[in-house]
Amino acid sequence: PIMSDEPEDVEDITSICGGLNINIGTLNQRSIQAMFRAGEKAASLGHVLLLDPVGAGASALRTNTAVDLMEQLPFTVIRGNISEIKTLALGSGKTRGVDADVSDAVSDENLDSAVAFVKDFAQRSHAIVAVTGAIDLVSDGQRCFVIRNGRPEMGKITGTGCQLSGMMTAFVVANPDRRLEAAAAAVCAMGLAGEIGWSRMAQGDGNSTYRNRIIDAIYNMDGAALDKGAKYEVR
């Protein structure tokens, strides 16, 4: 992958890539311009586009930029935590920086309504919508994967969501005829890596070690391990 945010560079780079992951984490006026130019180029080439609306709801600039991107570009996938996705769906919301607001969390108690919400937003946005958290939801508007892989400790490592967005872009690009399943598989793989990584932690290990354990688990994971370890149902 190449991470480019120079407006004069992004069209050339986008042309040689199979997919584009637009992550608004490091937002500024130059990167906003680059995002739109790269997105327009990717759309013209029929490439996979993924939007990661990092921190949408935390500031007016982030919210407005994410909404504008969603309205002007034909995203294949939109991935975020529940607060970020609610911000896009409703046009406003609240997050705690890059973290979801506790009151928004998907749980067994509100699962039915959360699934209905994600399906509705996927239909309206014409995109696969992936909501990640303690319980992950991935929907194309018709079906919804409810995924239960992962560890709560993953939430203490900054960047796991961004890492997942990169993986998801690659999974969807590699499986053009099964995009929903590919997006769900990426979520399962990331969560499973968190489980495997945590099982290999030793006394005295901390976040830095855990981050690397997750990366190692992803690197060493194959299809058989993913099939065996994935925890999901389809609604």
Name each model feature, range by range.
Residues 1-45:
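Active-site cofactor/substrate anionic-group-binding motifs, chiefly glycine-
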Residues 31-80:
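Glycine/small-residue-rich loop that forms an oxyanion/phosphate-binding "nest" at active or ligand-binding sites
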Residues 63-144:
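Conserved phosphate/ATP/ADP-binding segment of small-molecule kinases
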